Amino acid sequence: MAIALAEADKYEVLEKIGCGSFGIIRKVKRKSDGFILCRKEINYIKMSTKEREQLTAEFNILSSLRHPNIVAYYHREHLKASQDLYLYMEYCGGGDLSMVIKNLKRTNKYAEEDFVWRILSQLVTALYRCHYGTDPAEVGSNLLGPAPKPSGLKGKQAQMTILHRDLKPENIFLGSDNTVKLGDFGLSKLMHSHDFASTYVGTPFYMSPEICAAEKYTLRSDIWAVGCIMYELCQREPPFNARTHIQLVQKIREGKFAPLPDFYSSELKNVIASCLRVNPDHRPDTATLINTPVIRLMRREVELNNLSRAARKREEATMQKAKDVEQAFAKLEKEKQQIRSELENSIRREWEVKARLEIDRQVQNELDKLRKRFECEVQDRVAQEVEKQRRNANYREDASLRSSGHSSQMSSSNSEDSDFPSSTDISQLSLESPTNKAAKLPKKESRTPFTRSKTVVDSPMDIQMAEPSPISIASLSLSPRRTSATYSGKNIFAEGERKRPKFEPTLAYSDDEDDTPELPSPTRPKVKPDPFKAPSRPLLRQNTTALMQKLSTQPPIFPANPSRLPQMSAPDVRESKSRSPHRRLSKIPSSANLAADAGSPTRKNGVKSSPSKMNGGDEMFKAVMQRNMGGRTLVELAQARAGGRPIDEVKRCASDSRSGCSVPMKSADRDPPAVWDPERDEMPSPFLARGRKVIRNLR
């Protein structure tokens, strides 16, 4: 039971086709490969012994028959629990012949003669296999030649024949391409060739006259049934029909039937008429019918169709195999490429690892070398720096001892030589002098009110255009009579220079100042200074520079004879202040320094010059007054360039250096250089021009 249920689970029921004499017929699908089958379900509980014998005979007949025009039998299943028997047979998708006849009758049409001959030839071929136990010989190319004789049965089946005994349109099935399939061998009987069936079976419309006369059933009884089926296919009704069974038997024994329509050929009419003869000896047998010329021609056509179908199947199978081979080849190629890529990747990764290890090793070696070199270099630098610091420390100790011993001598020599502190020139320097390496940080400029930080350079768009020409013709000085300086105020560069403020305060005023600085107007447009032009210097107050007429009446700042200056008993406070060697030196001394170095807070009258010199001075004074000149005289400028010393002393030192009488002195024995302190002294500049705006109280 479990085995039967397991077998039943292998199939899927699709639909119910119909009912047979012993059970139900269903359309099923095999789950393993999707093959469509026809299952005949038979319940043998209520069967009699005779019916069970017929069922067993059908099993034996179906298992022994294998023909293209006979329904194929595959296997069976026996369900003992429910006493059911399943027969799995070939499925015919075209229906049966009775459905074709009904469709023709419903549409009021007649079957074509070609279709009738094709059905007749295949049906006769199937009966030939049942009656003679072998397949008929192939027609081949000899269509019009003599027909071969039937060979008959051989071996143990030589005296066995199969009678269908139930031929009717319902038992003739059609395939998808109108292939005839003879089936339903439930009433068939396996008998000896010399025996005759005496049992009355079959459908009354297709009974032969000998069956009606209670005579023996022979092979020619199936030929009578074939004639009745072909007549009904052409005429759309049976040849013998009556309301009662007795009338039907009388008509069959008489053998009279209505003629076929005239559009059918005489050959078809003669074949059907020969099959419907009352005397069975006058009827043709299966071998005679199969050798009819038209049937042979139809068989040849069927053979060609089968050959073409087989060739098409083989071609499809070949194409499928070729496709499978191509797919397998493509798969192999893909696997080959994959294996190759994997191999290349593995080799590349291996070599990359080796290369990386080698690179790391070489890099590590180089790093070790660099570390060793760095350590050696650091040690050398440290040793050099230690030696240098040691030498500097020794030098500073020696310099401090020397400076303390000669401090008094330095002060006396400074007072006797000149009124100004001596400045250091290149002849007074030595290799032992300390160097000033301290870098001074630039002072950060603070922002003023109503101003913005300058982040970009001025462009020409910041200057107002006065005229299209960038330069005036008047500035070219084409006239030889022009004596004044050329000035053009209409080109863009002069206009920009004129509109630019000459001086901007860098520091905002504070509350402790007396005067309020002039702040820029917030409404006046500002023009940023042009980085490509030299900035103009502002003027200081007028009272910071002495007038020429005042300077001309006073004696010169530097006396001609420094020995006449009175010696101060107490040292000056400003002189005692140590001058830092790192402070910026200035060769132009101020009036305060001159007065302090002279030893008197007042200026003394100098020696009167000769009349010739006085006359020259008056003339120079007049020229100065006419030209409105201010500042220091040329003599004072020359003395300033000489470092604050008198010109006579400078000339004397120069002559002594040329004569070789001077003895080189060390830096410790020389006078300290002159220093100008911007925080204490006032330094008027002689290079200022008049007519500019004066900035007051700017510190």
Swiss-Prot record:
InterPro entries referenced in this protein's UniProt entry, alphabetically: Kinase-like_dom_sf, NEK_Ser/Thr_kinase, Prot_kinase_dom, Ser/Thr_kinase_AS
Region (Disordered): 386-463, 490-538, 553-617, 651-685
PTM characteristics: Recessive mutations of NIMA cause a specific cell cycle block in G2 at restrictive temperature due to lack of phosphorylation that normally activates the G2-kinase.
Top-level division of the source organism's lineage: Eukaryota
Enzyme class (EC, first level): transferase
Polar residues composition bias: residue spans: 425-436
Main location: nucleus
This protein's record includes keyword Metal-binding: no
Name of the featured protein: G2-specific protein kinase nimA
Organism the protein comes from: Emericella nidulans (strain FGSC A4 / ATCC 38163 / CBS 112.46 / NRRL 194 / M139)
Gene name as annotated: nimA
